[in-house]
Amino acid sequence: MSQAVSYAILVLTIIAFLLTAAALCTPAWQVVYAREIRQWVQSGLWLSCQTRPNGMYSCTYTFSHDDFNTYFSDEVSGFRTPSFYPWQRTLFHIYLISQAFAMLSLISFCVSVSHKESKMPNILRSVFLVLAAVIAFGCLIAFAVYSYMVEYRFFHVSVSGIYEKHRGYSWYIALTGAFVYLVAIILSVVHVLLQARNSNTTMSRQNINSSLQSDFFEYQYHPNRSMESFEDRFAMRTLPPVPRQEKKTTVF
């Protein structure tokens, strides 16, 4: 039972890690269709893509504030590049920390396989999963708050061409990954409790067996010992308690 739960946690952690990685690698965190220029515009944490009227799909990316910090890019001619904001880059870096904690939880599982009697690897795995889930949920909430602000909610093409952005499939993929992390945390806590209970049961059985063995060897007759020492031990043995005499009451 405990081993099955442990492998279920492993599978859920891998699924959550891959879902979060897929969300980070795709640009559809905010999506808008600009009818004036007939383009779908997708804005991610580090990647922004748009479709041209001729069907061409072009993307721009940023890893620093100096890459694309203006609304138009002089380096790319002929099409508009969505602006990147510092909070997007910050959330991306924080998300990478969450993924690092998920990797540490997987490493803790590998350690727990080789040290089955130790509780520490499983406890560390639970702690790393909690940290990964908390950071993931925090980033999702922060993105929802920022994307709802007026400054980052609309895509401006012209004075009259203002279009509202909506959360895209990348955000929902990341949300699914965060909930899978949450399920893995619940199973991880259950696994730690099961391991603690099994450990206590094993220790109690060992104590009982050692006590019985010590009592057996204490009163066992050894032919190498003298008869007098055996008789002395037999005479000094603990006697059972005297049974109580029940008073009989006669009813007339």
From Swiss-Prot:
Tell me the PANTHER family matching this sequence: CLC-LIKE PROTEIN 2, EPITHELIAL MEMBRANE PROTEIN-RELATED
Q: Per the record's keyword annotation, is Heme included, yes or no?
A: no
Please tell me whether the keyword Hydrolase is annotated for this protein: no
The cellular location(s) given in this protein's UniProt record come to: Membrane
- Show which residues constitute the signal peptide: none
The protein here is known as Clc-like protein 2
Q: Name one GO cellular component term.
A: membrane
One Pfam family matching this protein? Clc-like
The record's Gene Ontology biological-process terms are: epithelial cell-cell adhesion
Concerning Gene3D superfamilies, the annotation shows: 1.20.140.150
Checking InterPro entries in the record gives: Claudin_CS, Clc_prot-like, PMP-22/EMP/MP20-like
Membrane topology category: Multi-pass membrane protein
Q: Which residues cross the membrane?
A: 7-29, 91-111, 127-147, 173-193
Entry similarity comment: Belongs to the Clc family.
